[in-house]
């Protein structure tokens, strides 16, 4: 897909990856960009910068997503690309609030389902359309310190795979974005924390912290090639391959790696463990 002339909706667009994508799509000649986020003030600022429309939206509300899609289709005649990008990170295990898991499931998984349910009928009728869902490298690997994030991001990857397999013959293309860490204010604060939060932040930054512009460049290239996996940190492909080759070895290595992280003995950049049995990554607060 080439971005020029396209009608695009981006959720989670007030900052980070979403804002970076909006700005890049504008530079590449998108016809119309709708930027949606809970932060109404910031999302309208982004929309103003890209000459688009800013909308206050809760992605866990299916009625609201359907209404937005219907409005854009009525005004623009079509939606070419829906970027389901909203997300956040928290670090909790089994002892954590189960309500927090429910909320994260709503944002990281059900929001993608709601978007697909709303936008696919029109795309299928036209015989073309593109879904870009933001997950995380944690969806391919794991996130030490966060059960909630690990589980929901893995589910997001699985959903994207299902959508691509099920609807490709109807002209629908699907990509899933799986970055490690991307520079945001929230990520900066994570480094000042302790325990699982700090460990998770160190882990995510193992292969470098990218700017939102660098992530947007990787996305545009992947969309142009209609590539399913979008990996701004290319190292993740090798990590996932090693995990698939010998999962038991990977799990053993990850346990040792986790111990080192919590002990504070793993400096930034020293992430391959157990003779190349990998680390993982998490991403961005989208």
Q: How would you describe each model-predicted region?
A:
Residues 169-235:
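SDR active-site lid
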Residues 66, 88-102, 125, 145-148:
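Conserved mid-core segment of classical short-chain dehydrogenase/reductases
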Residues 28, 141, 162-173:
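Active-site-adjacent segment of SDR/Rossmann-fold oxidoreductases
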Residues 116, 152:
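Active-site helix of classical SDR
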Residues 136:
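Residue(s) in the substrate-gating loop at a strand-loop-helix junction
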Residues 2-33:
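Canonical Rossmann dinucleotide-binding motif of NAD(H)/NADP(H)-dependent dehydrogenases/reductases
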Residues 40-41, 57-67, 98:
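The beta1-alpha1 cofactor-binding region of Rossmann-like NAD(H)/NADP(H)-dependent oxidoreductases
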